[in-house]
């Protein structure tokens, strides 16, 4: 039986696969550029021909793809297309700039000047971009310095979309794109100076909204949030034997050269290991000699010999010490010893690398970290930790920092005794051995001292007979005879010491728990700061969503201008009479209170921006949820949120207060300045449009008149846009209202389409009524717009 043929891959899927493959190749090239900027320029000169070929390929690829990417930017962006465009632009700029610096180095031979130019040490910080956003309420200026600045600006632009013309948004987004070319286009690795994980993103907020809050406010939870979406952590583990493992398989080397390099590497590693062992020195012999002496006494005893109290005390203390040895492998012991050990590891790695370079190439390569080694050595500890090293991973640094924190706090004797109780046992064992060595283990009162020492060690473990630190006991309950004042004072002093010890133990346990909790909280921030961060998909996805919203508005106006019949009421004669007639007929009626919830949701839908589109998902949420995400992510003040929530309910369609626009001045913001007053004016205009269309449908019995947004239509696989009949709010002050009263059979705007332009709510409703009247009078079955 013949196998079934493989299923055909759709054209969009095939195109997406090709773009992903191309994106991987460009990312590889960008990563090579970043390495060559930091490597010995002699290495780049040896590969100059291949680098020029790669630069030419990137130039051809950019020239070939740029028209298609620009066309897609005007149609519908995706995070993939945005990322590919950013990488191509960065690869084209930096590749040719690196070639120029290599050619300059071939002439001058100045290594320091080469790194100064390639690393931008003499240039100002490139991550500063001035943004100017033109709105109906005035211009807004701000500066982009961090990745979260980009995300915040895009969220603010999304919230202000209804008072921003497409031309102003396009100019601002172009400046944002320039910043993202330098920030996101530089490959996968995020420069540390760009990322600030203490600023939560929109995804952080959405995650907190769907998880249990346990009584905490969203602002409090966001303050403790460490963002892992704009940039994501990449765990890096370095193997100390990588050079030894991969050197035998290095290409382009002769067998003799590889063998010579391996021999030199083994010798270098052996010398560094021997030097490290000599510097480390033998462990202190104090505690080990005590244990050896105790073990010798215990080994000399057997069951045929009598067990003295002193020997039994030694055995009991040795038991507690053995238990402590088994418990030593705690979390702290898994950390690196200290930062000096990491520095020693870096030195060993550098020594081995230099030895191999000398054996293979006869010279020491002048990489960036070697050419500027003096400057790097002058950095303080914080900067050195952020820069990192070649032989130590960020996780090793984090563990060393935590261990140093514990070591600093555990210098307190009480905490040290709580964490290492075996120290008490060793001290007690040392005292018992000293007394036995002095010949005092034969009986009498001296026999109580070893037993008291053993009981003290057991009590420190939470076991043993409760006794005072001096081994003294109070009178037994059945004892006869009067108790002297001296005995009472002695017992009271013992009780005070015991209570003091118990209080100190409880206090140290609580302090140690607080220390552990603090370390756990701070570890998350250390991991985000020191670990290697890679770019997430939040910024490309956010940029694409916001840009698509404004591109849809411009595209809608361009498509409707090419309709078969265009009726422009903005300058037509006789429109004022239509305005007066429709206004007077609608103001005599009120909106049915039962319709207020539905028109409130319609208001939220028109006010919301293009970024948060939860109402269009497969598992759609109501429009108020998407608007909630929009206003909360920009930090809208509570009184404005309350005003926005009750904007429709406050008017209710009663009286004439909801009709705020003058003739042919709908969505006009003349005389209004400031973002908040302009936003409030736009809300009033949108409320007027919603109430007017609701009353129009109920008064003239023409069915529901759909209010739509220009970005409600997405391109089909054939690149077509379908706009159903209805009244569209374009948010453009020059032509805010467009009514599509007829469209083609496929739903696209074409020769059979009838479009009405207007700047007045009542006159455009009159035009819609004129178009519907013949069909309604003749009992036509066409659905109303």
Curated annotation (Swiss-Prot):
This is Tripartite terminase subunit 1. Component of the molecular motor that translocates viral genomic DNA in empty capsid during DNA packaging. Forms a tripartite terminase complex together with TRM2 and TRM3 in the host cytoplasm. Once the complex reaches the host nucleus, it interacts with the capsid portal vertex. This portal forms a ring in which genomic DNA is translocated into the capsid. TRM1 carries an endonuclease activity that plays an important role for the cleavage of concatemeric viral DNA into unit length genomes. GO terms for molecular function: ATP binding; zinc ion binding. It comes from Human herpesvirus 2 (strain HG52). InterPro entries: UL28/UL56. A zinc finger (C3H1-type) spans 201-229. Keywords: ATP-binding, Host nucleus, Late protein, Metal-binding, Nucleotide-binding, Viral genome packaging, Viral release from host cell, Zinc, Zinc-finger. It is found in: Host nucleus. Belongs to the herpesviridae TRM1 protein family.
């Amino acid at each position: 039986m013949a196998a079934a043929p493989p299923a055909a891959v759709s054209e969009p899927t095939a195109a997406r696969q090709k773009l992903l493959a191309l994106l991987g190749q460009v990312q590889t090239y960008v990563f090579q550029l970043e390495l060559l900027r930091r490597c010995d320029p002699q290495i780049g000169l040896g590969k100059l021909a291949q680098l020029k070929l790669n630069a030419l390929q990137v130039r051809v690829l950019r020239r070939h793809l740029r028209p298609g990417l620009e066309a897609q930017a005007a149609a519908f962006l995706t995070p993939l297309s945005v990322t590919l465009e950013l990488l191509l632009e960065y690869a084209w700029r930096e590749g040719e700039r690196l070639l120029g610096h290599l050619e300059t180095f071939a002439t001058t031979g100045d290594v320091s000047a080469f790194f100064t130019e390639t690393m931008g040490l003499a240039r100002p910080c490139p991550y500063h971009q001035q943004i100017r956003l033109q709105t109906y309420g005035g211009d807004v200026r701000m500066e982009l310095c961090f990745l979260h600045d980009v995300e915040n600006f895009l969220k603010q632009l999304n919230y202000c979309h209804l008072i921003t013309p497409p031309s102003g948004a396009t100019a601002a987004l172009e400046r944002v794109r320039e910043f993202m070319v330098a920030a996101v286009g530089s490959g996968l690795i995020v420069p540390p100076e760009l990322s600030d994980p203490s600023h939560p993103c929109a995804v952080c907020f959405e995650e907190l909204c769907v998880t249990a809050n346990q009584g905490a406010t969203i602002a409090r939870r966001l303050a403790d949030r460490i963002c892992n979406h704009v940039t994501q952590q990449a765990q890096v583990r370095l193997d100390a034997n990588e050079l030894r493992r991969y050197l035998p398989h290095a290409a382009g080397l002769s067998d003799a050269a590889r063998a010579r390099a391996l021999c030199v590497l083994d010798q270098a590693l052996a010398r560094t290991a021997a030097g490290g062992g000599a510097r480390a020195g033998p462990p202190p012999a104090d505690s080990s000699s005590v244990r050896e002496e105790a073990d010798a006494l215990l080994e000399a005893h057997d069951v045929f010999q009598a067990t003295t109290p002193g020997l039994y005390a030694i055995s009991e203390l040795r038991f507690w010490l053995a238990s402590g040895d088994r418990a030593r492998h705690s979390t702290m012991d898994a950390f690196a010893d200290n930062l000096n050990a990491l520095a020693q590891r870096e030195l060993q790695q550098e020594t081995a690398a230099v030895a191999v370079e000398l054996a293979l190439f006869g010279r020491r390569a002048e990489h960036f970290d070697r050419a500027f080694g003096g400057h790097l050595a002058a950095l303080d500890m914080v900067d050195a930790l952020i820069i990192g090293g070649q032989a130590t991973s960020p996780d090793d640094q984090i563990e060393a920092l935590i261990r140093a924190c514990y070591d600093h706090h555990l210098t307190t004797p009480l905490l040290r005794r709580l964490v290492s109780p075996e120290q008490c046992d060793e001290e007690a064992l040392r005292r018992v051995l000293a007394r036995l060595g002095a010949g005092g283990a034969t009986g009498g009162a001296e026999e109580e001292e070893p037993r008291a020492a053993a009981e003290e060690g057991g009590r420190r473990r939470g076991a043993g007979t409760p006794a005072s630190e001096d081994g003294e006991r109070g009178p037994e309950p059945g004892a006869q005879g009067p108790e002297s004042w001296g005995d009472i004072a002695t017992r009271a002093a013992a009780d005070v010491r015991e209570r003091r010890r118990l209080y100190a133990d409880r206090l140290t346990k609580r302090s140690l728990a607080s220390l552990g909790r603090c370390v756990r909280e701070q570890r998350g921030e250390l991991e985000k700061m020191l670990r290697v961060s890679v770019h997430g998909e939040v910024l490309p996805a956010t940029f694409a969503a916001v840009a698509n919203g404004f591109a849809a508005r411009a595209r809608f106006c361009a498509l409707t201008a090419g309709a078969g019949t265009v009726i422009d009421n903005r300058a037509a004669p006789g429109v004022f009479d239509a305005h007066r007639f429709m206004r007077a007929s609608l103001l005599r009626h009120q909106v049915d209170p039962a319709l207020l919830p539905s028109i409130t949701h319609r208001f939220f839908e028109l006010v919301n921006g293009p970024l948060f589109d939860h109402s269009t998902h497969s598992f759609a949420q109501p429009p108020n949820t998407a608007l909630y995400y929009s206003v909360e992510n920009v930090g809208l003040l509570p009184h404005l949120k309350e005003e926005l929530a009750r904007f429709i309910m406050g008017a209710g369609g009663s009286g004439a207060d909801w009709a705020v626009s003058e003739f042919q001045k709908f969505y006009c913001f003349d005389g209004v300045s400031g973002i908040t007053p302009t936003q409030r004016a736009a809300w009033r205009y949108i409320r007027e449009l919603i109430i007017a269309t609701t009353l129009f449908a109920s008064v003239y019995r023409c069915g529901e008149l759909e209010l739509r947004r220009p970005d409600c239509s997405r391109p089909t696989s054939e690149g077509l846009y379908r706009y159903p009949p209805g009244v569209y709010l374009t948010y453009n002050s020059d032509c805010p209202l467009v009514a599509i009263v007829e469209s083609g059979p496929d739903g696209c705007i074409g020769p059979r389409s009838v479009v009405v332009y207007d700047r007045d709510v009542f006159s455009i409703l009159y035009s819609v009524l004129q178009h519907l009247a013949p069909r309604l009078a003749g009992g036509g079955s066409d659905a109303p717009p």
